[in-house]
């Protein structure tokens, strides 16, 4: 069945088998089966095809975490849901997918079948991307990277009355990872960045257009995070605007994150042709 381009097959999972051995042979998790059904249901009858066969896709997602001291760290609200759903949708469409992610705030059953690389800091992320970026056809930079990091590491917990001084003396900006990685982009590769914004798209549009040039990517997807029921989390819905380097923008209306991931990939494939 795997060889049929209009059949979505889920591979057996790894875990404790009936014979008391650990190995591959379990039914995929219910959450993943439900996700696959939602993906299929989002297509019209006989519309589904594995149109990404033989394509390698590299996706980042989730937050990074930068250590302050033994008890504190700098991070953000990203759950890793959008990056994961992009990964599963690309896999459902036939691609070979690698998902590089920070700490996930969603059920890890949903990662079943995805080749994953877990990272923690921005340095970890850059190292992983440098190892993998040259082989991919598409790169989705969906990770929410911490804006700041601490330059001096400490294994102790800093007293509260000293924390302000420590931060003021040791804060530095994290380099723009997408901008850095884009310098090694090949002509046949497609790089997609992501940008969260608040307020109206009219207010954010100029900044977004500047970012796509600064970051050196082919497309930048911008989505609002200050609207009720949208933004962070697996169950949240989303909408957004896909910008390209020709000042064109393509709106994807408010929908579930898996449907959004599917429509976004479809839009990028169609624009690349």
Predicted regions mapped to residue ranges:
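Positively charged, low-complexity intrinsically disordered leader regions
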Residues: 26, 41-56, 205
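Glycine-rich phosphate-binding loop
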Residues: 117-194, 198-229
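Gly/Ser/Thr-rich active-site loops/lids in small-molecule metabolic enzymes
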Residues: 75-89, 93, 158-179, 214-219, ...
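A structural motif corresponding to the C-terminal end of an alpha-helix
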Residues: 6-7, 89-97, 176-189
């Amino acid at each position: 069945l795997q060889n049929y381009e209009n059949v979505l097959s889920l591979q057996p999972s790894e875990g404790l088998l009936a014979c008391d051995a650990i190995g591959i042979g379990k039914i995929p998790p219910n959450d993943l089966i439900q996700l696959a059904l939602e993906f299929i249901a989002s297509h019209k009858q006989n519309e589904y095809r594995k149109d990404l066969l033989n394509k390698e896709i590299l996706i980042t997602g989730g937050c990074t975490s930068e250590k302050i001291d033994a008890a504190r760290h700098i991070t953000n609200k990203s759950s890793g849901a959008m990056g994961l759903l992009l990964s599963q949708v690309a896999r459902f469409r036939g691609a070979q997918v690698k998902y590089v992610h920070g700490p996930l705030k969603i059920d890890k059953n949903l990662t079943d079948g995805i080749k994953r690389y877990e990272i923690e800091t921005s340095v970890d992320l850059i190292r992983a991307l440098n190892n993998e970026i040259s082989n991919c056809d598409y790169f989705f930079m969906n990770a929410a990277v911490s804006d700041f990091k601490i330059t001096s590491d400490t294994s102790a917990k800093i007293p509260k009355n000293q924390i302000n001084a420590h931060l003021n003396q040791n804060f530095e900006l994290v380099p723009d990872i997408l901008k850095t990685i884009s310098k090694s982009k090949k002509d046949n590769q497609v790089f997609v960045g992501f940008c969260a914004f608040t307020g109206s798209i009219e207010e954010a549009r100029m900044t977004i257009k500047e970012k796509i040039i600064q970051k050196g990517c082919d497309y930048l997807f911008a989505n609002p995070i200050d609207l009720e029921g949208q933004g962070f989390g697996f169950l949240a819905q989303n909408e957004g605007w896909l910008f390209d380097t020709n000042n064109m923008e393509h709106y994807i209306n408010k929908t579930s994150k898996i449907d959004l991931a599917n429509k976004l990939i479809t839009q990028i494939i169609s624009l690349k042709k």
